[in-house]
Amino acid sequence: MELKAEEEEVGGVQPVSIQAFASSSTLHGLAHIFSYERLSLKRALWALCFLGSLAVLLCVCTERVQYYFHYHHVTKLDEVAASQLTFPAVTLCNLNEFRFSQVSKNDLYHAGELLALLNNRYEIPDTQMADEKQLEILQDKANFRSFKPKPFNMREFYDRAGHDIRDMLLSCHFRGEVCSAEDFKVVFTRYGKCYTFNSGRDGRPRLKTMKGGTGNGLEIMLDIQQDEYLPVWGETDETSFEAGIKVQIHSQDEPPFIDQLGFGVAPGFQTFVACQEQRLIYLPPPWGTCKAVTMDSDLDFFDSYSITACRIDCETRYLVENCNCRMVHMPGDAPYCTPEQYKECADPALDFLVEKDQEYCVCEMPCNLTRYGKELSMVKIPSKASAKYLAKKFNKSEQYIGENILVLDIFFEVLNYETIEQKKAYEIAGLLGDIGGQMGLFIGASILTVLELFDYAYEVIKHKLCRRGKCQKEAKRSSADKGVALSLDDVKRHNPCESLRGHPAGMTYAANILPHHPARGTFEDFTC
């Protein structure tokens, strides 16, 4: 009997019945379905209700899982007050790239056709449209008889012939304090030689402002020098029909992209630009499409990633690949394009890339971005009351003041910034919470209930497998070993002397019954 019991123990204890498990389970309704009663209408109704609830639960959970894998996001908009804000970088360019007075005979010889001042035969194309004074100067410079051309460099030409901020800047104030041309850093763009205020480069700290409103930002008065504009006798990519400046307000962490993102400021007006800093936070895939910026910007010519840096980087690579040169405003160490390369290759290629090619330069949105919202308003200057005063102050005519002077006032509207943040509409915690809530509502289950079911299923499966297969053989082998051990123990525990001593007559044998034992003796004496 002991061997049989131990064999059953090795084979595995039989799990409790389904009725016993159901009666103690925390899963609602299970005890009513698997009860000890005979099959009845009550049990059938309970089973039907349980299966219906389970089906609804599966449908709801499936819908929640599908919704999660759509990776929806929502946008949170907030305004945060600040005690101070970093003033943005302000880049400005004169819409005229080259000053007429700075174009030399050598410049005209090499770049006259590019500037539409000369035709391909080095002749002035239409003398009837020229101003007499400009025509006389141009005819003298265009006389190339016995002229020996010198080496020409486009970068040097842009730098020398571009408008000088020291000549354009008539007045400058930041937060009521006087500033000067030294506070502007030269930067080259597609508009040529431009200037950036508060660039934050060359070891200069970024300027901050403590208040909002006019008078607490940058206010400058500029002379656009229309008398230095190149005469327009034809159309090229370098030709400008406008008069004024182009302005871009941007973060110090991104280069200016003024030909695409700038706004115009006209002479004869004071332009007010009320700004608000906007901090944008986008989500990376799969919730969004932004690019997570790392220490390595993945750009060839810029240390930090931004959309404008990516565009300039891409345009530079495109021109180097197609024209074997780069424009003056482009970074890198490739040679600068010659005027002929500008006209024949660089300008057409860049125009095609900007306007038509939507696949070559695909720049992803960075996940963190700072931009500046703007509201512009203008008033006419000079007034009739101030025209004579300004003409006398700057030693110009009233007509010149009206045609060339502009005032630009850039300030924060209020001292706060706006955050526009993308957030996950549905996270894993929400998914688990919804599934858990639906489980509790429809079948009264929790995670521990599911563990109960798995534990019971494991015990049943283990018992079935052990009865059919390997466990049974191992049980028999183990039982045999234990049986031998038990027999030896029984022998050791057995004491025959006690039973023999208790025999009333004892046991005696004849002397000859045992060899070499001459005397009679009892069996007790022999064995004990």
Curated annotation (Swiss-Prot):
Residues 67-427 are extracellular. Expressed in neurons throughout the central and peripheral nervous system. Changing D347A: Loss of inhibition by mambalgin-1. Changed pH-gating as lower pH is required for activation. Changing F352L: Complete loss in the shift of pH for both activation and desensitization by the spider venom psalmotoxin-1. Decreased inhibition by mambalgin-1. It holds the Pfam family ASC. GO terms for cellular component: cell surface; dendrite; glutamatergic synapse; Golgi apparatus; plasma membrane; postsynaptic density membrane; presynapse. GO terms for biological process: associative learning; behavioral fear response; calcium ion transmembrane transport; cellular response to pH; memory; negative regulation of neurotransmitter secretion; neurotransmitter secretion; regulation of membrane potential. The record marks D357 as: Involved in proton-dependent gating. It is found in: Cell membrane; Postsynaptic cell membrane; Cell projection, Dendrite. It catalyses: Na(+)(in) = Na(+)(out); K(+)(in) = K(+)(out); Li(+)(in) = Li(+)(out); Ca(2+)(in) = Ca(2+)(out). One of its GO terms (molecular function) is monoatomic ion-gated channel activity. Glycans are attached at N368, N395. It is a multi-pass membrane protein. The record marks F352 as: Involved in the inhibition by the spider venom psalmotoxin-1. It comes from the Eukaryota. InterPro entries: ENaC, ENaC_chordates, ENaC_CS. Belongs to the amiloride-sensitive sodium channel (TC 1.A.6) family. ASIC1 subfamily. This is Acid-sensing ion channel 1. It comes from Homo sapiens. The lineage of its organism: Eukaryota, Metazoa, Chordata, Craniata, Vertebrata.
